[in-house]
């Protein structure tokens, strides 16, 4: 997760977030080149003492500064469109997780298993362990297997919410009366944090998301323990 004074993205934990990192770097490279070029042109014009009193138009340069921006936009738009389609793709999921947003907590249902559902509340600061993370710890973690394609169905019971986990490259609106879906693939074990990213009332800041990624064997044991509880 992000640390103090970190200026970059969180470490990617899914292939899609890695692709978003690459796209960000690609776009920033284009923007830096344009910024340097424009600064150089403005600097040379500012310190240039030459005057042309007879310049009325310049069809050649007007054509150039129309074609070049179009070319730059294509360079940025093509990988962006590719990512948009990839983010919307749901590829044969092995597990389905249903998430319901409430004021102000999350409910989870594992649709592929019987009677596995729970609520996830933020742990207050005065009840948290010393090693805990303020405003991010929850009483029930959402456990998911790594190296597995997961589909998540997202809705809300009252107002608009948004289920967001930056390390996985996920941000999906939770809308009352509507079921949104997306998929993701966690490529390493760990604990990944997120929060509601849609202002949903007084306690909007106290709706953390805590994903624990484990191997398949540990996930099956967790499922068995939850089924017996």
Swiss-Prot record:
Catalysed conversion reaction: 4 Fe(II)-[cytochrome c] + O2 + 8 H(+)(in) = 4 Fe(III)-[cytochrome c] + 2 H2O + 4 H(+)(out)
| Annotated transmembrane regions | 27-48, 63-82
What EC number(s) does its UniProt record assign? 7.1.1.9
Give the location in the cell. Answer: Mitochondrion inner membrane
Topological relation to the membrane, as annotated: Multi-pass membrane protein
Binding, Cu cation A2: 196, 198, 200, 204
- What is the required cofactor set for this protein? Cu cation
Reading the lineage from the top rank, the first entry is Eukaryota
Amino-acid positions noted as binding Mg(2+) in the UniProt annotation, renumbered to this chain: 198
Q: Where, in this chain's numbering, is Cu cation A1 bound?
A: 161, 196, 200, 207
Cofactor binding note from Swiss-Prot or TrEMBL:
Binds a dinuclear copper A center per subunit.
Keywords of this entry? Copper, Electron transport, Magnesium, Membrane, Metal-binding, Mitochondrion, Mitochondrion inner membrane, Respiratory chain, Translocase, Transmembrane, Transmembrane helix, Transport
Query: Topology: which residues are Mitochondrial matrix?
Result: 49-62
List the Mitochondrial intermembrane topological domains.
Answer: 1-26, 83-229
Carries keyword Magnesium? yes
Cited CDD domains: CcO_II_C (cd13912)
| GO BP field | ATP synthesis coupled electron transport
Identify the InterPro entries for this entry. CcO_II, CcO_II-like_C, CcO_II_C, Copper_CuA, Cupredoxin, Cyt_c_oxidase_su2, Cyt_c_oxidase_su2_TM_dom, Cyt_c_oxidase_su2_TM_sf
Q: Name one GO cellular component term.
A: mitochondrial inner membrane
Care to name a GO molecular-function term for this sequence?
Answer: cytochrome-c oxidase activity
Q: Which family does it belong to?
A: Belongs to the cytochrome c oxidase subunit 2 family.
Q: Subunit arrangement?
A: Component of the cytochrome c oxidase (complex IV, CIV), a multisubunit enzyme composed of a catalytic core of 3 subunits and several supernumerary subunits. The complex exists as a monomer or a dimer and forms supercomplexes (SCs) in the inner mitochondrial membrane with ubiquinol-cytochrome c oxidoreductase (cytochrome b-c1 complex, complex III, CIII).
Question: What the protein does?
Answer: Component of the cytochrome c oxidase, the last enzyme in the mitochondrial electron transport chain which drives oxidative phosphorylation. The respiratory chain contains 3 multisubunit complexes succinate dehydrogenase (complex II, CII), ubiquinol-cytochrome c oxidoreductase (cytochrome b-c1 complex, complex III, CIII) and cytochrome c oxidase (complex IV, CIV), that cooperate to transfer electrons derived from NADH and succinate to molecular oxygen, creating an electrochemical gradient over the inner membrane that drives transmembrane transport and the ATP synthase.
Q: What is this protein called?
A: Cytochrome c oxidase subunit 2
